[in-house]
């Protein structure tokens, strides 16, 4: 359930502060990620050059590391950037498809062993792979992975990170406390890049607060609420994407709280 003590005003603070997010991006979704970061009021940097690492890290308020289209060049860039960023900047890891490709999983484990990430954001099969949990899901998208709360908690404790496990019900945990997002939009699961966008939006929120817990919850609920509202004004995936970016770009704290009040369930209990 949504708790009153969560600092929902972070939405307005992102727009006021305009944090810079350095994205080591999935090239399939790089434009969507840049647009999403911009829509919430932050400024995206989409650098691909290792030689720029020091300068880009100095400019950035937070970093999002995405393994979606990892290759040798990007692996070098990621390590170079992380060496420059640690421990100065908040870091988000998006371990795309580590459950499907052993080499990706090996690389993700090496990053997690060598660097500390404030947040790990992935679907159930990806998070399960990081902790070697048994699951029957294959491919990039998660299927019906059992014990998702337990898997997320295990991952959070192992890597001393907050885990945002996204899916039918989004789970956020620090290994002790668990928050389950009350909102879900089916189109978010159909839209390529929804997770990538969320990872970088979380980074945007980390760029303006040291409260990682609130940043993860507010960013995740914001994206879900925008998805639900987009459903109301769209007829298919194409028009939904337009409405989704519109909702992201106009939603502020007041609008989100009004959305809670309009909902059929009492989300604020």
Curated annotation (Swiss-Prot):
The keyword Coiled coil does not apply. Pathway: Cofactor biosynthesis; thiamine diphosphate biosynthesis; 4-methyl-5-(2-phosphoethyl)-thiazole from 5-(2-hydroxyethyl)-4-methylthiazole: step 1/1. InterPro entries: Hyethyz_kinase, Ribokinase-like. Substrate binds at residues 46, 193. Its EC number is 2.7.1.50. One of its GO terms (molecular function) is hydroxyethylthiazole kinase activity. It comes from the Bacteria. SUPFAM superfamilies: Ribokinase-like. Keywords: ATP-binding, Kinase, Magnesium, Metal-binding, Nucleotide-binding, Thiamine biosynthesis, Transferase. It catalyses: 5-(2-hydroxyethyl)-4-methylthiazole + ATP = 4-methyl-5-(2-phosphooxyethyl)-thiazole + ADP + H(+). GO terms for biological process: thiamine biosynthetic process; thiamine diphosphate biosynthetic process. Its cofactor is Mg(2+). ATP binds at residues 121, 166. NCBIfam families: PRK09355.1. Catalyzes the phosphorylation of the hydroxyl group of 4-methyl-5-beta-hydroxyethylthiazole (THZ). Belongs to the Thz kinase family. This is Hydroxyethylthiazole kinase. The lineage of its organism: Bacteria, Bacillati, Bacillota, Bacilli, Lactobacillales. The gene is thiM.
């Amino acid at each position: 359930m949504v708790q009153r003590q969560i600092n929902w005003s972070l939405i307005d603070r992102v727009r006021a502060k305009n944090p810079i997010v350095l994205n080591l991006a999935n090239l399939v979704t790089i434009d969507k990620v840049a647009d999403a970061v911009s829509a919430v009021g932050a400024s995206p940097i989409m650098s691909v050059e290792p030689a720029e690492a020091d300068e880009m890290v100095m400019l950035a308020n937070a970093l999002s590391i995405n393994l979606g289209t990892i290759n040798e060049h990007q692996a070098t860039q990621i390590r170079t950037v992380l060496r420059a960023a640690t421990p100065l900047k908040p870091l988000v890891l998006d371990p795309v498809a580590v459950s499907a490709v052993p080499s990706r999983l090996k690389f993700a484990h090496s990053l997690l062993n060598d660097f500390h990430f404030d947040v790990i954001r992935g679907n159930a099969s990806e998070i399960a792979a990081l902790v070697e949990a048994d699951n029957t899901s294959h491919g990039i998208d998660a299927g019906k992975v059992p014990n998702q709360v337990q898997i997320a908690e295990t991952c959070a404790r192992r890597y001393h990170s907050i885990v945002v496990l996204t899916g039918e019900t989004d789970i956020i945990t620090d290994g002790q406390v668990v928050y389950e997002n009350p909102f879900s939009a089916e189109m978010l699961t159909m839209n390529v890049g929804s997770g990538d966008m969320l990872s970088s939006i979380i980074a945007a929120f980390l760029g303006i607060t040291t409260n990682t817990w609130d940043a993860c919850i507010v960013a995740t609920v914001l994206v879900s609420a925008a998805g639900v509202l987009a459903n109301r004004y769209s007829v298919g995936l194409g028009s939904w994407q337009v409405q989704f970016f519109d909702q992201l770009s106009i939603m502020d704290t007041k609008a989100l709280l009004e959305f809670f009040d309009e909902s059929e369930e009492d989300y604020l209990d």
